[in-house]
């Protein structure tokens, strides 16, 4: 008979953040004798679950998807916006081989470098700072003909806010003594995602043929004319920018075109119009043989160069367990099942070898304040049985209550949710100790600790950017390390299991065995 395993259990209390003020704090207003005792007597620390520490922009609240990806990856997993910000700050962007080759190819052949993208500080589909860096890269590498095709936002930014952005770029080109804004058009045309090809065609013709409904000497003048026609940024009609005596910026064979949007959904259609030989969305008046670069991969079936391919996460916690012939269980309710499986595994849908999964149905209620305990009793029953079974080397469990009930904004319900969790943690702790296992209790982000917005006085239904607790329960004598983050959890678990930490994991163990 096989030896009974002493599992390493990770319990993720979703939306269970740490905040010392009791007011509007469902966690501190709940009766939680079990968690209180664990915090008082067991090794513990606070860890970051938001902002740069999880690969999001500075001070941005965490979320469950990002949280679980970081938990399972054992390294900070940067979102595209932050990844590019970091690359530009550290100047590795300026050495990106795909971008530099594309610029050099055009320069050496006496061809133009065209840059297109959403000129916006919105940071949702693109960021104008990234476009500015691309202009600088092209200029630094000696490109003489640099043409910017500006898509205007007004959707993730105020409806009439493009003027400052356009002026910034016109000033930049003036300072460089080369390059210019060659066209402006609203994102309504250039960034459609619903196969409204008549819109896309207008943006395509504007850039390929240098033909539009309107023409202006400068980008700012073109924008002001659009405002006079009562067009907000998003809806600015195709406008060619060319002063008298300036060369035409129409695209020619051999030119380079770099698309600086990082979000895929609204970048695909216009990219296909440029790249696909068999494109049939509209009859293209001019088909140009371009050296086309996508900033990120917009779709796997678009065959063209990608400056920043998707980061594949090798050796996540789940994969490392499988490689080491360990058994693992993932268990949660419907609401967070994808998080302990797909997201924790770094975006991999298929279970790894030795990975089992248990899904507990979340209750069928309109909103979870009506049943704040959710399915936690059944989840705990199954979790305890799994711990006691001796089958698993490691178990990952998520309790959704703090987050799902926190989102309702109903304080009394959130308190009940937290109290239900305390009862569950008591049973789980006893089960782990009875088999000589180890337990880490943490959260993926905050929520229930802030149930009212202090600024507005309204119910606070969103996540927070506050730290989350991390508690160790087990037989090892350990010392907690300060200053941790979610991506330190996987290395912590491996270290406590006495396993090697793969080199891809840059996180650090937060409990050191003494």
From Swiss-Prot:
Mn(2+) 1 binds at residues 403, 407, 463. Monomer. GO terms for molecular function: manganese ion binding; phosphoglycerate mutase activity. Belongs to the BPG-independent phosphoglycerate mutase family. Its cofactor is Mn(2+). Keywords: Glycolysis, Isomerase, Manganese, Metal-binding. It catalyses: (2R)-2-phosphoglycerate = (2R)-3-phosphoglycerate. GO terms for cellular component: cytosol. The lineage of its organism: Bacteria, Pseudomonadati, Pseudomonadota, Gammaproteobacteria, Enterobacterales. The gene is gpmI. HAMAP family: GpmI (MF_01038). This is 2,3-bisphosphoglycerate-independent phosphoglycerate mutase. Binds 2 manganese ions per subunit. Mn(2+) 2 binds at residues 14, 64, 444-445. Disulfide bonds: none annotated. The active site is at 64 (phosphoserine intermediate). It comes from the Bacteria. GO terms for biological process: glucose catabolic process; glycolytic process.
